[in-house]
């Protein structure tokens, strides 16, 4: 291996050192660098292009369902935060505060937003007067800061991160529930149809829901190292924020009523899940749906065939561009084909075209898939049409591998020892009957650093959650009459235990 190849390649093992491997892929594939301040990163163009692809999909779906983009200040007055006590208690340890402007002390501390409910709700109160103003839906693409003390990991855990946060107000509880479920479905669609990652939909236990929320629902993705990633959350806020910030409206009979609100967000943690799920010991692996370049064309020539090969490759590149394919023709001098193969594998381009004198003579193209190196030969005349089939095949390979991994790593347990032993040996998700008591989760968390990442959603999930909010405990059908795996009391739901990012 040349010095260039040695510097270019991944040296850590995904299987044996997943943390070091992940950090190396993120840096060497040009996604991000570490900032001089601990807990912050510099997002490079290739990494930001992945975020833009996520934005483009979600933003279109949001707008198709009545959401408008807006922007609110990044600083929140302290007394605004204090108006919703659960927000204060939930986020205070993570809030970064501004206390000085220039050389002057501020009259009131300003929080660097950890989330924006407390700065958006007062304006919803101003903008909503009548039932005709509802539903009101706004979203903003921004960054937030949470001064977490835990070890940081690019895209998974950083003090500042990019995300979108949607905020809505509704006339009825039923409409707010429909909104909460719709946004969760859109996050599910993003992972399943765009990122190539199968996810589970669930509800957070009460002790782990968003501060001030009635219910928090999430999508959860399983990583190859057996840990779960919370991929996006949708919160039914009930009337807590509306009460705190006086979001009221006149109904059709001119009676004053309190609105119901929701909030929902997805961060660049999705990029971390994308990298961790699909990439390998050769570098980044990306699904064609989000890859900045979907196809790279690498010419292979001797001096006497250079002109013919490069002309052939350039013509194919032009045809692919006309088909809407994001293609790069790598005609650099000074880099041999082997170096280019390794570099584009490291950078995660899903499909590689190899073109040499034989391809030119036979009017063909050699096509190589990034995930598994599968190589096929296609007729030149059909390549502009066939390329989409190859891109779909690559996506299916990535999704199917992730789906198989998920299916193999959801296990069941009916007692405490089995929960601990299964997670300790295999990782992944362990389904167990649970009584709903936080102390039972704490026993598992203290022993093995695993927690309840979700309670699965059934077909009637919204009605179930609403019933529980009214004080009814509704056993799930598959655990009716069973005992909690930890304490032995009556089980009222299924819990998914896992270690998580």
Curated annotation (Swiss-Prot):
Top-level EC class: ligase
Disulfide bonds: none
GO cellular component: a single term: cytoplasm
Cellular compartments annotated: Cytoplasm
Superkingdom of the source species: Archaea
InterPro entries: aa-tRNA-synt_IIb (IPR002314), aa-tRNA-synth_II (IPR006195), aa-tRNA-synth_II/BPL/LPL (IPR045864), Anticodon-bd (IPR004154), Anticodon-bd_dom_sf (IPR036621), Pro-tRNA-ligase_IIa (IPR002316), Pro-tRNA-ligase_IIa_arc-type (IPR004499), Pro-tRNA_ligase_II_C (IPR016061)
UniProtKB keywords: Aminoacyl-tRNA synthetase, ATP-binding, Cytoplasm, Ligase, Nucleotide-binding, Protein biosynthesis
Catalytic activity: tRNA(Pro) + L-proline + ATP = L-prolyl-tRNA(Pro) + AMP + diphosphate
This enzyme's EC code(s): 6.1.1.15
Entry annotated with the keyword rRNA processing: no
Keyword Ligase: yes
GO biological process, one term: prolyl-tRNA aminoacylation
GO molecular function annotations of the record: ATP binding; proline-tRNA ligase activity
Self-association and partners: Homodimer.
Similarity field: Belongs to the class-II aminoacyl-tRNA synthetase family. ProS type 3 subfamily.
Record comment regarding domains: Consists of three domains: the N-terminal catalytic domain, the anticodon-binding domain and the C-terminal extension.
Function (record text): Catalyzes the attachment of proline to tRNA(Pro) in a two-step reaction: proline is first activated by ATP to form Pro-AMP and then transferred to the acceptor end of tRNA(Pro).
Protein name: Proline--tRNA ligase
């Amino acid at each position: 291996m040349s010095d260039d190849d040695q510097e270019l390649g991944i040296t850590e093992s995904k299987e044996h050192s997943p943390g070091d491997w992940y950090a190396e892929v993120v840096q060497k594939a040009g996604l991000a660098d570490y900032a001089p301040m601990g807990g912050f990163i510099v997002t490079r163009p290739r990494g930001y292009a992945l975020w833009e692809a996520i934005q483009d999909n979600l933003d279109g779906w949001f707008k198709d369902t009545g959401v408008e983009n807006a922007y609110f200040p990044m600083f929140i007055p302290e007394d605004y935060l204090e108006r919703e006590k659960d927000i204060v208690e939930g986020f205070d340890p993570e809030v970064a505060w501004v206390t000085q402007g220039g050389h002057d002390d501020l009259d009131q501390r300003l929080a660097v937003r950890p989330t924006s409910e407390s700065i958006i709700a007062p304006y919803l109160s101003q903008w909503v007067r009548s039932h005709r103003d509802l539903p009101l839906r706004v979203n903003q693409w921004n960054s937030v800061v949470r001064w977490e003390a835990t070890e940081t990991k690019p895209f998974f855990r950083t003090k500042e991160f990019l995300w979108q946060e949607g905020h809505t107000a509704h006339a009825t509880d039923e409409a707010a529930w429909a909104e909460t479920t719709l946004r969760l479905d859109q996050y599910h669609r993003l992972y399943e149809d765009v990122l190539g990652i199968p996810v589970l939909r669930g509800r957070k236990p009460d002790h782990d829901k968003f501060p001030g929320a009635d219910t928090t629902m999430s999508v959860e993705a399983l990583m190859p190292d057996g840990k779960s990633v919370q991929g996006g959350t949708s919160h039914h806020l009930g009337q807590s924020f509306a009460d705190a910030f006086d979001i009221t409206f006149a109904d059709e009979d001119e009676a004053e009523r309190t609105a119901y609100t929701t909030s929902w967000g997805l961060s660049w943690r999705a990029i971390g899940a994308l990298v961790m799920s699909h990439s390998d010991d050769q570098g980044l692996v990306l699904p064609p749906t989000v890859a900045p370049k979907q196809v790279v064309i690498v010419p292979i020539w001797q001096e006497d065939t250079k002109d013919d090969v490069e002309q052939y490759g350039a013509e194919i590149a032009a045809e692919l561009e006309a088909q809407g394919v994001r293609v790069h023709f790598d005609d650099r001098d000074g880099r041999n084909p082997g170096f280019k193969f390794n570099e584009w594998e490291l950078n995660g381009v899903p499909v590689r075209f190899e073109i040499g004198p034989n391809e030119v003579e036979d009017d063909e193209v050699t096509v190589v898939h990034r995930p598994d190196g599968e190589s096929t030969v296609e007729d030149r005349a059909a390549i502009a049409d066939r390329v989409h089939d190859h891109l779909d095949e690559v996506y299916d390979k990535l999704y199917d591998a992730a789906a198989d991994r998920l299916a193999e790593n959801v296990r069941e347990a009916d007692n405490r020892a089995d929960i601990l032993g299964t997670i300790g040996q295999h990782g992944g998700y362990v389904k167990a009957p649970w009584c709903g008591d936080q102390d039972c989760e704490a026993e598992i968390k203290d022993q093995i650093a695993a927690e309840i990442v979700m309670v699965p959603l059934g077909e009637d999930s919204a009605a179930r959650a609403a019933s529980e909010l009214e004080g009814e405990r509704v056993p799930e059908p598959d655990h009716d009459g069973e005992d909690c795996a930890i304490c032995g009391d009556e089980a009222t739901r299924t819990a998914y235990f896992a270690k998580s990012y």
